[in-house]
Structures are given as C-alpha cells and as structure tokens.
Amino acid sequence: MSIEVFNESGYDGVNEEMLIDVLSFALGEMDIHPDAEASIHIVDSDTIAELHVKWLDLEGPTDVMSFPMDELTPGYSRPDGGAPGPAMLGDIVLCPEFAEKQATKAGHDLSHELALLTVHGCLHLLGYDHVEPAQEREMFALQNELLADWYDDVDRRGVVYQPKPTGPGAFPTAADRLELDQTMIAEEQGEPGESGASAR
C-alpha cells in the first residue's frame, strides 16, 4: 500500500508510523490491491469543524471524516473477485485534539483511539456506512475485528506501538460510541445530564 500522512495539526503524540501500519493492515485484510493509495490528514479542531459543516452540514468538530475517491469492492484476492488494479482510495481526516477527549472518556490512550478511528475511516473509504441499524452492526463488528487482529499481528511481528487496551470502551459497539458522543456533546453544552445526537 502507498499511504501518505500529512500532519497539519501541530498536535504532539501522534504516531504516524502506527497509523500507516494499521491502515495498511486493514486494507490488506479487506483484499484491497497492494498498490492502492490512500492518505491520512491530521488536522486541528477548527479545520475539521469547517469540513464537518461543509460536507455534512453538521456544526462543531468531530473525530474522523472520510473522503472516498474510487468506488471499489473488497475482494481483490478472491478467486471470483477479479483484479481491479491499483486505486486511489481517498483521504481519511483525523482530529487528535477531539480524539484525545474521546479516548479519555473511553478509558484508553490517544494512540489506540487514533488506530480505531483510522480503521473506521478505512471502512468508510471502502463503502461501509452506519446509517441503518444493520449496517451499523456490521461495520462496528468488522471495525473491532480488524483492530483486534491488527494488535495480534503487531505482537507476532514484535513491533511495539501502544499496548492493546482491555477496557469496555476499547472495542466499542455502535451503541457504546453513541453514548460516548452524547456524553461529550452534553458536557460541551454544559449540561452533563442530557444527551444529544452526533454523526460521524
């Protein structure tokens, strides 16, 4: 895979090598052509808030956004999958400032949160979504499976990034993330007991 990272956030603590590793692994597991290209943009809260409004008409910053370029179906290495050739998959945009707040609430570190969000963004590039409940369950289950398998792969290779977290928020269901989103929105609005709605 050809993956470029552009860190425009000025944020310390972002392991770019780890982000490339987890994205490469996820794409490989999804049978995407090994010469496919993608990019990861790491931005500040103001930048992702602008993108959030421009593309989704939603106010405020968010954790991850994806901008697919080529429509393709996973299955490059399947006998019946054909060989579509290399593709420019698109861009994943991450906001570590926002992600760190989520990580703290979920009980793990920023690096794990960014790995999780990178896999989430990767699946969006490949056409997965979570608009309908069935889609949501499928996407989050696959996200957690890929992330857990990546940790196992890293361990087999003897590579050290962050330790694999074991807390309940480390491999969240869609309901877990919705609850986290609602908690953060309520706190930002100064209403810790109330909940709102958020879309990624």
Swiss-Prot record:
Signal sequence region: none
One GO MF term attached to the UniProt entry: RNA endonuclease activity
Gene that this sequence comes from: ybeY
Cofactor(s) required for function per UniProt: Zn(2+)
EC number(s) recorded for this UniProt protein: 3.1.-.-
TM spans (from-to): none
InterPro entries xref list: MetalPrtase_cat_dom_sf_prd, YbeY, YbeY_CS
UniProt-listed GO biological process terms: rRNA processing
Record function comment: Single strand-specific metallo-endoribonuclease involved in late-stage 70S ribosome quality control and in maturation of the 3' terminus of the 16S rRNA.
Compartments where found: Cytoplasm
Annotated Zn(2+) binding sites: 120, 124, 130
Cofactor remark: Binds 1 zinc ion.
Family that this chain belongs to: Belongs to the endoribonuclease YbeY family.
SUPFAM superfamilies linked: Metalloproteases ('zincins'), catalytic domain
Protein's name in the database: Endoribonuclease YbeY
GO cellular component, one term: cytoplasm
Domain of life: Bacteria
